[in-house]
C-alpha cells in the first residue's frame, strides 16, 4: 500500500479531487502498522541496519530492556492474539529478529516515536490532505503508543500527545481526525 497513489481501478488523484469538490471525503490511514509487502519493510529486510527505514519498526531488541519481554510484560499487553505480539523478521544476511506485530504477520507495527516514522506519517497525512480529505480516520490509533510495562493500548498521556502531533499536521488543511480506538478507552486503567 502506498498513500501516494490511487489504485488505477478507481482512477487517479484528479478523480478523487473532483469528488472532493462535491462530497465530504473521509480517508482511512493505518497509523499503527504497515504492510509487510511495503517497499519500506522490504528495504528493511534487505538492508537491516543500513536501511533508511531501520527505525520505522519496533524492534524487540530495542524496545525491551533485555531484548525480550518478561512473561509478566507479555501478560500485561492488550493483545489481539494469544501470544506475544511479534513476527520474526528474516533478513537478507540470514539473521532474524523479532519486530512488533499487533494484528497479523502482514501488518508490521510502526515505531511512532522514531524520527523516521514521524516523517513518514507527516508525509502520508499531508498527501491525503492535499488530495481532498475532509476527514482522516486513524486506523488502530489506540495501539500506536507503546511503552514497556504497560498494556501498550491507549497509553496516557502519550496517546494524547501523539494525537496532537497528528492534528498539527492536518490543521492547516482544515481536516478533521477520527481516531479509531477499538475498545472503550477506560479499559486500559
Question: Language-model features: where?
Answer:
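Hydrophobic residues within beta-strands of alpha/beta enzymes
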Residues: 136-138
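Acidic/aromatic-lined carbohydrate-recognition and catalytic surfaces
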Residues: 1-122, 126, 130, 141-189
Amino acid at each position: 500500500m502506498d498513500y501516494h497513489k490511487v489504485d488505477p481501478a478507481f482512477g487517479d488523484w484528479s478523480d478523487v479531487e473532483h469528488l472532493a469538490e462535491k462530497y465530504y471525503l473521509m480517508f482511512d490511514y493505518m497509523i499503527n502498522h504497515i504492510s509487510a509487502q511495503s517497499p519500506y519493510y522490504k528495504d528493511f529486510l534487505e538492508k537491516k541496519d543500513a536501511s533508511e527505514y531501520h527505525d520505522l519498526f519496533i524492534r524487540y531488541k530495542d524496545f525491551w530492556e533485555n531484548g525480550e519481554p518478561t512473561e509478566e510484560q507479555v501478560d500485561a499487553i492488550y493483545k489481539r492474539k494469544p501470544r506475544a505480539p511479534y513476527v520474526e523478521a528474516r533478513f537478507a544476511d540470514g539473521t532474524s529478529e523479532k519486530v512488533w506485530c499487533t494484528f497479523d504477520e502482514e501488518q508490521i507495527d510502526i515505531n511512532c516515536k522514531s524520527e523516521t516514522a514521524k516523517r513518514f506519517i507527516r508525509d502520508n497525512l499531508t498527501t491525503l490532505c492535499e488530495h481532498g480529505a475532509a476527514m482522516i480516520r486513524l486506523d488502530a490509533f489506540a495501539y500506536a503508543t507503546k511503552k514497556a510495562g504497560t498494556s501498550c493500548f491507549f497509553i496516557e498521556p502519550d496517546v494524547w500527545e501523539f494525537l496532537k502531533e497528528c492534528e498539527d499536521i492536518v490543521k492547516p488543511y482544515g481536516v478533521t481526525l477520527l481516531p479509531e480506538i477499538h475498545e472503550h478507552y477506560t479499559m486500559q486503567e
